């Protein structure tokens, strides 16, 4: 493959990856706690782009539901799936059959040191993540920040794997609310139009290159 064709192929591959992130963002615009994905340059031989999460807070939607918790400020809830620690941003929690606090996907929320139970009238979650049933302490939600959002890897069910450096959490928990996805619909539409136009221009360049190569080969044949 010639240098010219390699450059064109890389440009088209980059556009395809970018369109994939835009599609994923648009599909999750109504998913609580969803973090927008951005494709950023990756200067390596293995990949042209890598994905990074937009850490901007989404707007807070009041639900008045006791087990809905919104985070404000950078950071994640720590949950557990089959013994593996994972991170989630969505606080749409529920109580399972054992009285444990779990995500909508069934992952155990780390922090509570006693069953939450089904009587939620007296359940209180403080801004620092402390859990209370009336005056009885139920523990402290495990909350962390990540040093490198680019190292977060999707684990399914709105969760992420992370093996990088962690930091203390200093944000705020809001009970009875959910964080909306931090997706700007207008911004995604503009990105879609720009990337689509660029991909179309790359495809035209491929067509021009093919015609030029065919012409050159035919001339060689005539000689």
Where are these regions (language model features)?
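Amphipathic alpha-helical polymerization modules
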Residues: 1-223
């Amino acid at each position: 493959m010639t240098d010219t064709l390699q450059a064109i192929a890389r440009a088209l591959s980059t556009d395809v990856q970018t369109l994939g992130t835009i599609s994923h963002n648009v599909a999750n615009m109504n998913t609580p706690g969803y973090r927008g994905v951005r494709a950023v340059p990756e200067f390596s031989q293995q990949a042209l782009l890598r994905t990074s999460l937009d850490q901007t807070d989404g707007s807070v939607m009041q639900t008045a539901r006791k087990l809905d918790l919104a985070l404000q400020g950078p950071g994640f809830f720590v949950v557990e799936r089959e013994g593996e620690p994972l991170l989630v941003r969505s606080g749409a929690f529920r109580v399972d059959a054992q009285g444990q606090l779990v995500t909508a996907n069934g992952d155990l929320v780390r922090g509570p040191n006693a069953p939450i139970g089904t009587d939620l009238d007296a359940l209180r979650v403080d801004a620092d993540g402390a859990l209370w049933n009336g005056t009885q302490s139920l523990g402290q939600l495990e909350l962390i920040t990540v040093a490198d959002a680019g190292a977060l890897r999707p684990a399914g069910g709105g969760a992420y794997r992370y093996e990088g450096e962690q930091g203390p959490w200093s944000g705020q928990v809001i009970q009875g609310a959910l964080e909306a996805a931090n997706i700007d619909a207008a911004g995604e539409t503009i990105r879609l139009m720009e990337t689509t136009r660029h991909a179309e221009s790359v495809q035209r360049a491929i067509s021009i290159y093919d015609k030029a190569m065919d012409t050159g080969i035919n001339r060689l044949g005539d000689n």
